[in-house]
Amino acid sequence: MTQVRNTSAGTSQGRGTRRNSWRVVDIVVAAVLAAVCAVIFWMWSNLLYPLVSASAVAYPPSGGLVAGGWLVAGTLGALIIRRPGAALFCELLAAVLEGFLGTHFGWTVVISGLIQGLGVELVFLLTRYRRFGLLTATVAGAVSGLFLAVGENLMYNYEWATDQKLVYAVFTTLSGAVIAGALMWFVMRALQATGVLGALASGAARRR
Amino acid sequence: MSTTTAPTMFGPRSGLLARANPVVKLLGALLITLVIVLSADPVTNGVALAGQLVLLAGVGLGPWRLLTRLWPVVLAALVSGWGTAMLSDAGGPVLLHLGWITITTGSLGAGAAIALRGLAIALPGITVLLTTDPTDLADGLAQTLGLPARFVLAALAAMRLVEVMITEWSVLAAARRARGAGGGRGPWGVLVEFGGQAFTLLVQSLRRATRLAMTMEARGFGAGPRTWARTPHYGRVDVLVGVAVVAIAAGALAVSLALGTHRFIWQ
Amino acid sequence: MTPRADPAPTGVAVGLENFGWHYPGRQDPSLTGISTTIAPGERVLLLGPSGAGKSTLLQALAGVEQDPDGQSGSGRVTVDGVDPRDARGVVGFMHQDPETQVILSRVGDDVAFGLENLAVPREQIWPRVRQALDRVDLQLPLEHPTTALSGGQKQRLALAGVMAMRPRLLLLDEPTASVDHDGARQLCAAVAGAVRADGITMVVVEHRVALWEPVVERVIVLDDHGRVAFDGPTRQTLHDARELLQEQGTWVPGWVPTTRPPARTGAGPAGPETSPRDHAGAPDPAGSTPGAGEVLLSARGLAVSRVQPPRRAIARRRRRALRAWRHGEPLPEAGPDAQLRPVAAGIDLDVRAGRALAVTGVNGAGKSTLALTLAGLLVPAEGSVRAAEALAAGAAPDPSLWDGGELVSRVGTVFQHPEHQFLRPTVREELEFGPRQLRRRAGRSSARTRGGTPSEADDAARVADLLRRLRLADLADANPFTLSGGQKRRLSVATVLAAAPRVLILDEPTFGQDARTWRELVDLLVAELDRGTAVVAVTHDRDLIAALEAEELRLGT
């Protein structure tokens, strides 16, 4: 009985198959990550509010260009937690909290969060949760942006002319790819350097 | 730093709706939301909005009090209405022609309908928010609706930290100013400083998250079946609220169907 | 877990067999070859240098260690003969951060959380919650919001949450490190009462030995390599290991590290016997060194508040004041504003070159708020803060009107939490940030720094000097967030010093620090005093006040 502690840390759940089961630390970090994304999004909308409302009055689809800010929780959650469902859980919870902080969205945030989280989740599912590189992140962000446009066009923008809906979709996809995709990958890398991800799948350093 | 204080995510709770069970309120709000989201015509949405206002006035939240507290919601609804009026291809006589902006009677009607709908969608969310305790809501979600307890409780614990994060945000602003950060000029400088501040908040919050996970795990969280110290209870108030909500949802549909105006969003 | 009806001695035995821990990516193991047993009911104080793996050991005993790749541990740990992870509810664990030991938003729910997880039947939960709250002397309604608690109360709440689970082994990881003196004593008393009454086995990690000495009966001291250096009865071990402990920076009872006193050139009037209110604006009787004792910053009739006017109102105030100042008119003083709810009022003080001023007072007396107001980071609720020309050096005489660049070269503020002030990805860049900022400004405008604009070479030399003096040279390329607590504290002070401000304002600089970091900080501050820098420290630390020969301003009396 010299080496009994060779199992994974965390919960009793964490002891069996490691890759795909959620430990307590994964769940709690995912939830807090969603919360902090919501707070940052709220600050970001406060900062951009004059700009965004002015541009929304001048040319509504331009709002799609900053839509990526709304989607960061999904990709960041997937990149950090690296568990099936992480994107969906983070994006849904963040959307609900963003809805609470901003209050002008109503319960449709639940639908929005599900649709957008699903977009990210699908991309990582296609890699079977094995690839978390810059490309995957960017594609995930873009798909999430596209899903956002589809959802918004259906739920809110249905009166818009079709070409305007398309412009909006292009804008949100771009914004998703850049802000929620590529940028979040760099954020994940910067977070790895700080050591705060040490307990998570994304932060585990290699053994020498 | 400024007086940007934490928004009252969950305001003071009193009155009939506050005593109703959160799950009933949530499901009711979702039902009304669903009816409005799927319906594009102003009659359905107008009746739904009116019904909600009557219900809220009945429990002591008059339209004036709502307006003074919720003007950003009204503003957002107006902005989205304007956007639609601009971009709708509904025809009719031209009312305004300004550069690329063309507004016709048809598009103005569409815009007005969107603004009305925006208000009607926002209201159920706000109502639940103003009258519900998050802990009670979590109890209901896990015990009544059977959502996974580990995720619901982690979300509840994370929600408590939102307030801590908002306070920390303003401390961070001062702490970084003391180092001379944010010296960059123009919008780019503002963005860079925002990014830096957000990153530090992210680091702090993730640190907190791993410590919180440790605390929760040490208290036996996630180890197996658990009991609940609080039980959600359902009473006469809930029946009343349920009936009112169904009446609003069904009434809105019934009126617009009777008038022949009902239209789904895909129609 | 079936609840035990019998509250008789219930401690469990703890066994460690050749236990070690090596985090992936680290050069050295945190713990090596620890073999010992702890008898049921034994109370142990675990000491050692920071980074020696004390926390890791406690986490392993609690079964909550966060092992990144599942291969960090070696050897064997048992609690009551089984793996700690199979002994949920047997072990109670507390760490030092109050904010993350509160889980739920109501006091009662928070204490009940652990009982729910142990599947205690509902009818037993609430009596046990009340009993646990009584036990830690926290008489609050069950609905009381947890956000309204002080740090010390939060820690006692956490203890109640742990004790309600009726643990048979209590593990405490620096439970009082983030709590003020009174809070620490109350917590300690609550722990002592609980473990003695139930005969619970206890292991506590804490570098404030005096606090726990009366409670524990055995002391284990780890060395730098994570091995057991001393192990034995409290008195004997503390005596035998005293030298090693002092070297490691443990606060052994009756000892304060010796530091050099400030030179105090310039016989200014500031002394411990004079109140700052006594010399309102009186000119300083000539000091022997030019500048020493000279007033750099003063406050008159000052009231301070955390509640600030809206951002736009502050910007308007700033524009108006700057316009008045450019036209040579007096700066407007802040009028009484009831909306701002001052936490402290009627403050008169002078901050003098080469002198230290300690701001003391009970929690909530407005000490930190005063510090931030003096630093120009908050606007006064009433009265004024004025910078003398020697400090303002061409800028407006009110610090709250300075922009970030003007601020760093004049007033350096060290916040209580070092990580809040980190801006760059490496230690070196962090230190270079301030000077670079100044140089960029100097290139842009005519803003002056003390003794003209430093050249790049001067900056590099200053950064190198700071790295060496603060023992951070080996870590120059490390990410600031990865440093230990003491290293972060030293870095946060160094980053501010890198911009060579004439006034240094520190919020609880020595709080929770080990004796080694404490001595280094004091040496650094004394050196700054000797250079003619004015030091303002918000502190509870009597030893610090004595070491800096600081004048004391007591708030809230």
Walk through the language-model features, giving the residues of each:
Chain C
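ABC ATPase C-loop
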Residues: 162-163, 496-497
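Conserved beta-strand-loop-alpha-helix hinge in the C-terminal portion
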Residues: 226-249, 546, 556-557
